[in-house]
Amino acid sequence: MDEIRKTGRVTIPTDLDVVPETLEILKKWGADAIRDCDGTDFPQQLKDADAKIYSTYYTTRKDNAWAKANPDEVQQCYIMTGFYTAPGDTVTIPLMKGISPELMQVNTNDDITRWWEVMDRTTGQPVPPEQWSYADGSVTVQAVPFHEYTVSFLAYLIWDPVHMYNATTNGWTNFEHQITFDVRQPKTHKYSMERLRKFIAEHPYVNVIRYTTFFHQFTLIFDELKREKFVDWYGYSASVSPYILNQFEQEVGYKFRPEYIIDQGYYNNQYRVPSKEFRDFQAFQRREVAKLAKEMWTSPTRAGARP
């Protein structure tokens, strides 16, 4: 009786140093596909294996040359300081205390009086920009004694949060931090589409392109010791910039406030009831991501690969 070959619906990961093991498991398990993943590289020896090739494609990172050459289009997010009680008529708040300096860098390039927000948490009201100032990594506030204050500010994600999460969790060493760039901004959008077409042309053996981190960032915040400070795998809150927020304002017809994302320091986690403004923001982000996803989906299908 002829042997019936049973293969399919199993995908196995691989790396440069496990080629023989990959082929062995491919045969034993009857897998029909091989893939790489974050932190691994696809071995060229396997491109002619009797299996489909799935290739991970990073739409927002793994191109530090571009990110370093275009720092104005590095991805950004909002972050809030801790609560600081005013001991007198002023209080000075350090912005990066409790935040990993490897992960974030304060954005002082854009108008801080427009895009930052100092909050009197005792009254729940914003402090007018003329009553606070920034210098040397801290904000000094003209305060009401014994009131609590926070600062919400924009920061560049100088280490991709997912890459940092994977590196920290797996204990990686001797690697370059991948900088995350904003595919929705003009220069990077144009470059990213050219980059994708080039990847497809140079990898004709790839059957399926596995997109990861699809133009938006999860909110992953680490402290100075690389411990998780806040993690939200579901939202779009770490995908902001003045460029994007100006578009949001034009669509919804009202002025954006950092507090819509910060939410008193809760960051609109899944246990919070979202405000109308945050729901508007989520809907806007979702439509923008879907529009760009459609554009990136079209390129590989035209070239014969599957996204």
Question: Where are the regions a protein language model picked out?
Answer:
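Glycan-processing catalytic domains of CAZymes
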Residues: 1-307
